[in-house]
Amino acid sequence: SAGEVLVKTLACGICGSDLHALRHGHEMVKSQKETGGPLVYDASRDLIMGHEFCAEILEVGSGVPDHLTSGDIVCSMPVLVRSDGVHTIGYSNEFPGGYAEHMLLSSQLLLPVRNGLSAAEAALTEPMAVGRHAVEKSSATGDDVCLVIGCGPVGLAVIAALKQKGLGPVLAADFSPRR
């Protein structure tokens, strides 16, 4: 479609939400339907997850800006914007995510990967953005003790964002003894 690019996945992270959907997909879809959430798919049908990804542009469609070309390395928000609405990538029976070899992305949502960042590092853009967003939404000030419960990838991203903003001290706790 116009404004879309075909990409080849270079790296894709495994999110806790993917694991939750794998084990509890039917309950997740039911909850989304009841609350008007965006993750409404048929959990009894196949889907290809993966929303933490880095990819290489293979082909550009009509209406794609000239600065985006084949061979560019990009990240993107995990949604596809079309004339009939916004479609979730990965949590969809029709729009595969980053665990697929190829996928379609909306050109207006692409973020070029620069400065020699590896594909594996760039695939962390989404969880790092979630952590930063959480800190931006908080009312934490330099005088606050910040508590982060959960030290998985997003929890670590929150800790990094807190430290980047000069907030803290930061206390972190996790139920997993491995963390």
Range-by-range predicted roles:
Residues 15:
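Short cysteine clusters
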Residues 1-12, 27-80, 114-116:
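Glycine-rich beta-strand-centered segment in the early N-terminal region that forms part
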